[in-house]
């Protein structure tokens, strides 16, 4: 970097320089303290701290740096040269930065410890969390993978913060979450991954009861098999993502047990992403304002075995997810996994009328049939866009009755497998969908030549578009 460029940066006000430093990792920001006394002073007031042991310990690890995109390339190169002089352990580095900043206001604190090459004593982590909470942090991000931390719970002060607006906790082989007392009056976003609660569902409900303005909740990698019941009851919630772990068994990825009860009392929810083994009961399902839903629910291995044993029975039912499916009736945009189609076939006594559904996506699987699709399309009077992610499915005696549907746009993701069978399915659609105005193919390069001939089968008002899929790029 030449002297002119250095002078251009040095004349910037402190507040702007602190803002620039907030785009760097804390390791890079700390390196600027070697430039001059002024930069050391600035580091004490950087509002965002990001500690990542994998980046700190591996000097050659590449991390996307937003300052490159903002035109500070020379500045970043200078910082990278200076940071080579840093030599200390990861825990000591965190201690030094927190000590330097003292009690200055803090917006975000991110701590990621997953490397394992420089083990961190859990007794060091708790004081770090306490320090940033006292400083009024609004965004706390904890990613911890520590085999040593298995007994004591996370500090309870996390759940008694008057300032937290966003809280992210991702823990593997870590402590339980102790939620005897919860008071998070400003928390709007809560992200929990692979965490365990004391008292399971009771502890989880206690946590939610202490978040009066919560708008977004993400529960990822939750082990539903250890919970006998599960309830989400938050009047202010707008977005919910709940994804359970699927356990491998007999070649399938499924939980072994059905939860007894699963309830949703979320009257203002507009977005739902839900992946879980079906429950025995759904006592309450309140999705009155739901706009978009991505549903992946599945049967247990025992239920799948029972289906196989009773496959010749008419209307074979091995579970009951009817109340949950009925609760989705107001949705406008709906995505269904192959496993969900199986649930509609064997665990749903009725398919409701989807009065508002305008966009439906079906993901296909060669081992799963389309039996419930005819009824689903018939019960969606306002459906305009239908998307098939693949056309291969288990053979049935009947084709899907689609001629009476109101679909105007059909989108199909094609693969190179069993292409002839897929083309025949497309021909059937073109012959039996008189209202179709647009057909869009997302295709693999090797199937292109066979798609051009389909234009002759479409009605004059139907436009056909061919778009290369990402796999072919």
From Swiss-Prot:
The lineage of its organism: Eukaryota, Viridiplantae, Streptophyta, Embryophyta, Tracheophyta. SMART domains: FBD, FBOX. This is Putative F-box/LRR-repeat protein At3g59170. InterPro entries: F-box-like_dom_sf, F-box_AtFBL13-like, F-box_dom, FBD, FBL60-like, LRR_dom_sf, LRR_FXL15/At3g58940/PEG3-like. Keywords: Leucine-rich repeat, Repeat. It comes from Arabidopsis thaliana (Mouse-ear cress). Gene3D superfamilies: 1.20.1280.50, Ribonuclease Inhibitor. CDD domains: F-box_AtFBL13-like. Residues 6-54 form the F-box domain. The keyword DNA-binding does not apply. PANTHER family: RNI-LIKE SUPERFAMILY PROTEIN. LRR repeats lie at residues 168-194, 196-221, 229-254, 333-364, 365-390.
């Amino acid at each position: 970097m030449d002297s002119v460029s250095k002078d251009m940066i040095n004349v910037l006000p402190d507040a702007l320089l602190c803002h620039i430093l907030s785009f760097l990792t804390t390791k890079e920001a700390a390196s600027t303290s070697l430039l001059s006394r002024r930069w050391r002073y600035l580091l004490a007031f950087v509002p965002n701290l990001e500690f990542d042991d994998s980046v700190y310990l591996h000097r050659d690890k590449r991390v996307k740096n937003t300052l490159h995109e903002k035109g500070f390339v020379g500045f970043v190169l200078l910082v990278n040269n200076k940071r080579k002089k840093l030599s200390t352990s990861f825990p000591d580095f965190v201690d030094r930065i927190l000590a330097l900043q003292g009690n200055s206001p803090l917006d975000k604190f991110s701590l990621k410890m997953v490397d394992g090459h420089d083990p961190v004593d859990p007794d060091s982590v708790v004081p770090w969390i306490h320090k940033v909470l006292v400083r009024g942090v609004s965004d706390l991000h904890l990613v911890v993978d520590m085999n040593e931390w298995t007994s004591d719970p996370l500090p309870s002060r996390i759940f008694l913060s008057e300032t937290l607006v966003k809280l992210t906790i991702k823990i593997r082989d870590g402590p339980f979450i102790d939620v005897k007392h919860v008071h998070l009056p400003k928390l709007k976003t809560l992200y929990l991954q692979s965490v365990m609660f004391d008292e399971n569902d009771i502890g989880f409900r206690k946590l939610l009861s202490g978040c009066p303005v919560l708008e977004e909740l993400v529960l990822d990698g939750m082990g539903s098999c250890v919970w006998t019941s599960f309830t989400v009851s938050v009047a202010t919630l707008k977005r919910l993502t709940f994804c359970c772990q699927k356990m491998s068994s007999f070649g399938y990825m499924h939980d072994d047990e059905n939860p007894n009860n699963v309830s949703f009392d979320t009257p203002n929810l507009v977005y739902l992403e839900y992946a879980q083994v079906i429950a025995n009961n759904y006592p309450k399902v309140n999705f009155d304002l739901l706009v978009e839903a991505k549903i992946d629910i599945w049967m247990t291995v025992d239920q799948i075995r029972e289906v196989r044993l009773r496959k010749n029975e008419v209307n074979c039912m091995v579970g009951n997810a009817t109340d949950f499916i009925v609760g989705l009736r107001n949705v406008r945009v709906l995505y269904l996994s192959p496993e969900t189609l199986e649930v509609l076939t064997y665990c749903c006594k009725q398919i409701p009328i989807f009065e508002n559904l305008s966009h439906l996506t079906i993901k296909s699987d060669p081992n799963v049939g389309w039996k419930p699709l005819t009824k689903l399309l018939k019960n969606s009077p306002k459906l305009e866009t239908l998307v098939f992610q693949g056309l291969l499915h288990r053979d049935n005696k009947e084709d899907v009755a689609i001629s009476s549907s109101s679909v105007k746009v059909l989108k199909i993701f094609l693969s190179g497998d069993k292409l002839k069978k897929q083309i025949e399915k497309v021909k059937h659609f073109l012959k039996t969908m008189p209202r179709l105005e647009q057909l869009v193919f997302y295709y693999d390069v090797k199937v292109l030549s066979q798609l051009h001939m389909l234009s002759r089968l479409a009605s004059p008002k139907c436009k056909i578009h061919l778009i290369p899929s990402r796999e072919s790029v």
